């Protein structure tokens, strides 16, 4: 537990399972109270109860669809009502979609954009003015290791392009906020063993090509515990065997009819 972080408050989105749950636990292990958000209320409340029991911190479970501005506003308001202020934001909610571009449903574009980009930007906008006033705060954005590839991975170009936009935004925000006491860090993880990647065909054929969430937990722990005058701009955590090192990912199993 970090004495400097004990009693602070973090919002973690997409936190009922997978990477988000792991990151909420990481924050709690540092003595940070956590407001966790996800769409499904049942698993969210279960996760909150687990965290309180294991880490002896305060939690708040807020059902939230990050594509809806009113849900984001409710998340921020309820967190401030319970904890007083928001010290840390871990933007993690995300969706993926694997299609060759010419076969990708057009309705996917808006869902991906609102979840993986606008949801992040809007939530940051809702919390950042209080951070600016206090001259203190930390924002961690879940980007993607796919943004390190050139060209972007085949069948993920819309997803990866939006993550590229998020990476650029996050980097620009770092420079805009660095003299105001606010840290902004981007995480660029490789393909991680979660239920989200379980839907991807070739990637999950060999478990050695997947990372565990522990590597990302360690990256977040590092970002939160470096000295006050230091901020990691980007942290790339890539499995040595990750498929993102190859520009082409075969597309075959899940949509053979397309």
Question: How should these model regions be labeled?
Answer:
Residues 30-46:
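Conserved glycine-rich Rossmann-like NAD(P)H-binding loop of the short-chain dehydrogenase/reductase
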Residues 144:
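Residue(s) in the substrate-gating loop at a strand-loop-helix junction
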Residues 42, 63-74, 106:
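The beta1-alpha1 cofactor-binding region of Rossmann-like NAD(H)/NADP(H)-dependent oxidoreductases
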Residues 16-17:
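Conserved glycine-rich cofactor-binding loop
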Residues 124, 160-162:
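Active-site helix of classical SDR
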Residues 100-101, 108-113:
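Substrate-binding pocket helix/loop in short-chain dehydrogenase/reductase
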